[in-house]
Each structure stands twice: as structure tokens, then as C-alpha cells.
From Swiss-Prot:
Its main location: secreted. One of its GO terms (cellular component) is extracellular region. Belongs to the frog skin active peptide (FSAP) family. Ocellatin subfamily. GO terms for biological process: defense response to bacterium. Expressed by the skin glands. This is Ocellatin-PT8. Has antibacterial activity against Gram-negative bacteria E.coli ATCC 25922 (MIC=60 uM), K.pneumoniae ATCC 700603 (MIC=240 uM) and S.choleraesuis ATCC 14028 (MIC=240 uM) and against Gram-positive bacterium S.aureus ATCC 29313 (MIC=240 uM). Shows no hemolytic activity and no cytotoxicity. It comes from Leptodactylus pustulatus. Residues 23-39 form a propeptide. It is found in: Secreted. Residues 1-22 form the signal peptide.
Length: 73
């Protein structure tokens, strides 16, 4: 009976250790994914900002050609 208890405790202990290792790896993977998402957002923000500047410049040039000045006259 004592042998079965020790075996059972050993199996449960090893199961808990492997489970905690898997959880730790999962958390690391999630952190890596979060970093990738932040990088993607950073690149998207840069592209979006550049696009806004290009549109503003294009609208300014169009307004100049049409004859509108910055005051709206």
C-alpha cells in the first residue's frame, strides 16, 4: 500500500511539474505575440501618419491650383 501511495504521489508531482512548465511556455509565447502585435501597430501608425501628411500636402496643392488660399478666400 505504501508503494502505491508513493507511486501515486510521484505521478501527481511529475504531472504538476510538466503542467507548470507548459503554462510557463504558453505565457512566454503570449508575451512574444504581444510584442509582435505592438511592432505591427507601430508600423501601421507610421504608415498612417505618412498617409495623412501626403493627403494634406495633396489637398494643399489642389487648393493652390483651384485658387483657394489658406484663409479660405
Amino acid at each position: 500500500m505504501a508503494f502505491l501511495k508513493k507511486s501515486l504521489f510521484l505521478v501527481l508531482f511529475l504531472g504538476l511539474v510538466s503542467l507548470s512548465i507548459c503554462d510557463e511556455e504558453k505565457r512566454q509565447d503570449e508575451d512574444d505575440d504581444d510584442d509582435d502585435d505592438e511592432e505591427k501597430r507601430g508600423v501601421f501608425d507610421i504608415i498612417k501618419g505618412a498617409g495623412k501628411q501626403l493627403i494634406a500636402r495633396a489637398m494643399g496643392k489642389i487648393a493652390e491650383k483651384v485658387g483657394l488660399n489658406k484663409d479660405g478666400n
